[in-house]
Amino acid sequence: MAPNIRKHHPLLKMINNSLIDLPTPSNISAWWNFGSLLGICLITQILTGLLLAAHYTADTTLAFSSVAHTCRNVQYGWLIRNLHANGASFFFICIYLHIGRGFYYGSYLFKETWNTGVTLLLTLMATAFVGYVLPWGQMSFWGATVITNLFSAIPYIGQTLVEWAWGGFSVDNPTLTRFFALHFLLPFMIAGLTLIHLTFLHESGSNNPLGIVSNSDKIPFHPYFSLKDILGFAIMLLLLTTLALFSPNLLGDPENFTPANPLVTPPHIKPEWYFLFAYAILRSIPNKLGGVLALAASVLILFLTPFLHKSKQRTMTFRPLSQLLFWLLVANLLILTWVGSQPVEHPFIIIGQMASITYFIIILVLFPMTSALENKMLNY
């Protein structure tokens, strides 16, 4: 019998082993759809981004006009831009749900997969930040100024580092040029890291909602999960096009319709919605270096989760106390997101400070304690 090309060709067999004949737990739920959705987000962003880059000019005098030109004069330029801008929001929705799934079901115990995933999140955040600067509107300029300025809080080398990053003494033309270069480069780094992420995942195989070894009950990825994934793609792309066509500016800041002006500061400088939780934590500490450290810790704490797992069970499926704590954490993050969008005044300051403290306490103290308590309860 002739050998099956799908199983023997050097390139096709890699695709076959990751997308066709991959043994998959039979009981994974829709929460396992978000990995492939993130892949679709990445492909969509790279394609729309490439088309936008073809019409964009990375120069302070022309950037804003070039984006306006794309929307007015390029065939479907308005659609490409709206898909790209809102695609970023969907990327973050999917990655936050994907991380939440990993946290709930103990997927972080695959340490290499988890750590490459957190690295992917950091790279995505960097990409979104430099991308937001490119249209060179008011919020682009002032957002870039405020966030890059945080590096000056680093002792001794801070100021030198910031001026080196800016390419001058303020955010200006050199900054915009290098941010464009970085925004073009980083998505390909994300694509490379994604392959590493998948390589580590396929070493161990997928986790499942029960958190138990599922080797005795695996089914092929295709057709079962390929079909399930396509349904996910359809739903997400439908939501994305609906947002991009009906209210493309819903999640944007009106300040960005005004060209960047270094002489006029917007009344409320705030990042896009997906950074608001971290921004709220940054603002809740009345010290520059302290705020920067808390901001970094709010995301880097994810690297610690494998070491904070004290439970005898992997997932939270049969751990009601941990479930309660998990949803408290979700609610806490929503409160932080809301506070981050509000002005710095009473009562938002104290709410932000309480929510920031609670965020760290839940992850660092309450989760391990609750796990230990649940272990004790298993004995009775």
Curated annotation (Swiss-Prot):
Gene3D superfamilies: Cytochrome Bc1 Complex, Chain C
Function according to Swiss-Prot or TrEMBL: Component of the ubiquinol-cytochrome c reductase complex (complex III or cytochrome b-c1 complex) that is part of the mitochondrial respiratory chain. The b-c1 complex mediates electron transfer from ubiquinol to cytochrome c. Contributes to the generation of a proton gradient across the mitochondrial membrane that is then used for ATP synthesis.
GO-annotated cellular components: mitochondrial inner membrane; respiratory chain complex III
CDD domains the record matches: cytochrome_b_C (cd00290), Cytochrome_b_N (cd00284)
Cofactor note: Binds 2 heme b groups non-covalently.
Protein name: Cytochrome b
Cofactor(s) this protein cannot do without: heme b
GO biological process: mitochondrial electron transport, ubiquinol to cytochrome c
Gene: MT-CYB
UniProt topology in membrane: Multi-pass membrane protein
Quaternary structure and interacting proteins, as annotated: The cytochrome bc1 complex contains 11 subunits: 3 respiratory subunits (MT-CYB, CYC1 and UQCRFS1), 2 core proteins (UQCRC1 and UQCRC2) and 6 low-molecular weight proteins (UQCRH/QCR6, UQCRB/QCR7, UQCRQ/QCR8, UQCR10/QCR9, UQCR11/QCR10 and a cleavage product of UQCRFS1). This cytochrome bc1 complex then forms a dimer.
GO molecular function, one term: ubiquinol-cytochrome-c reductase activity
Domain of life: Eukaryota
Residues that hold heme b b566 according to the record: 98, 197
Annotated signal peptide: none
Organism: Pharomachrus antisianus
